[in-house]
Amino acid sequence: GIEGIVNGMDPTEWNPATDKFLDITYDKNTVVMGKAAAKQALQAEVGLPLDASAPVFGYIGRLEEQKGCDIMMEAVPKLLKQCPNAQVVILGTGKKSMEKTLEKLDKLSPRMAGVVRFSNPIAHFITAGADFLMVPSRFEPCGLIQLHAMQYGTVPIVASTGGLVDTVKEGVTGFHMGAMDPDGLKPDDVEAMVDTCAAAAAAYGSPAHTKMSATCIGQDLSWRKPAAKWEAVLEEMMFNSGYGKKQMVVTPKEDLEGAKT
């Protein structure tokens, strides 16, 4: 049979309790206050208005079609129009055409920040300070970015594909926007992303959102569980193949008789 095992993440690099880039670290017991401080730091870093009540949507990654960035670039202006207090920050590099589009989006609104470069500190600021992390990938064998987000109590908004389906539970640890068309940019996909993000924005600050964030950060997303599954699968494969079993050696009768003479 086929066994699917999702990735784990490195808690030594991605851990809000020990993150060297955060002025105020936090854990599952202090996630509400910690994320509020991280949001303020993120807004100041990328030039967004300092507004604690604004739902902040983030994206970190390559700017390319596989990651659904063309969908996101079309969706963001609609989202900002539909949700007047929402803020968006996008960090990434990739296709030159998409980098230029992101530079244009950066000038679209004071509530939109586009950072066209790689920055590890800003990646950590977004992971901690955003309220939602957008992952609109057309395909994603497993993905790590959604695990990083949940580790920090940031709720992922994901396309329903690959490992994103396995790691993000609708209404429990995130929002699903449905599967994206793999063959090109479709208006229905853009609308699905806008609608899902708008629904998340409407839920922001509610008890349901607070519970979702707490559920995210309360998970063990390290390699401990995946490693145990790998070990169990490999042991089963070895057993089924007969590897390591003692082989019974039967000596032919004529050889035994010959040995007596």
Can you say where each PLM-predicted feature lies in the sequence?
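Catalytic cores of carbohydrate-active enzymes across secretory and cytosolic contexts
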Residues: 1-261
